[in-house]
């Protein structure tokens, strides 16, 4: 069983939101990204026009108050349509783990240190603290962003405790009965 995860949290003070206020083009993530709109903020985060939301035939994706895509794990069936539509490749399908709750990095920002923090308040700064403390050795930093192999994560959450930016979150799986209950509600809409 798979489900989609968006590797971005964004913030209410995101530079992208401010820049979108002066953008007068089509309200599409793909068009916004294709135009090469220059950003002084995170150029790897969710653009927030909801192309993924429109692509999801199950209504599993919404935009939160920060205009960042969020997937409802109880409604997502793991079809993968959203993964192909995101121009910044923020959405991935994650396989269900044997562990009830694993750790996941909700960031895709490739900037480091201060530059990363200036771009977004919820960023991974690539400090590698999580790599050093992981007892399962399932974390690596690639392009200045920590990546956790959820198939090897045991859910100890040691990495969450040492992350100075709070970029690592628990990824819980919804039980099949709850998924069916929520899917029934979606079908009624």
Each language-model region and where it sits:
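Ferredoxin-type iron-sulfur electron-transfer modules and their immediate structural context
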Residues: 1-69, 73-75, 80-133, 162, ...
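Strongly charged, low-complexity linkers/loops
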Residues: 129, 135-147
């Amino acid at each position: 069983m798979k489900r989609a995860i968006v590797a971005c949290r964004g913030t209410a003070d995101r530079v992208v939101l401010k820049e979108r206020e002066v953008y007068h083009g089509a309200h599409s993530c793909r068009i916004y990204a294709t135009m090469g709109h220059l950003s002084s903020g995170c150029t790897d985060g969710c653009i927030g026009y909801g192309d993924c939301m429109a692509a999801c035939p199950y209504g599993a994706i919404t935009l939160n108050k920060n205009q960042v895509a969020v997937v409802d794990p109880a409604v997502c069936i793991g079809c993968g349509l959203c993964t192909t539509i995101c121009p910044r490749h923020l959405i991935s399908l994650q396989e269900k783990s044997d562990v009830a709750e694993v750790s996941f990095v909700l960031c895709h920002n490739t900037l480091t240190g201060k530059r990363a923090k200036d771009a977004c308040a919820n960023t991974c700064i690539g400090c590698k603290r999580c790599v050093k403390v992981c007892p399962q050795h399932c974390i690596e930093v690639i392009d200045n962003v920590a990546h956790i192999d959820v198939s090897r994560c045991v859910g100890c959450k040691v990495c969450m405790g040492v992350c100075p930016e709070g970029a690592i979150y628990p990824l819980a799986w919804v039980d099949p009965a709850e998924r069916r209950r929520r899917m029934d509600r979606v079908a009624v809409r």
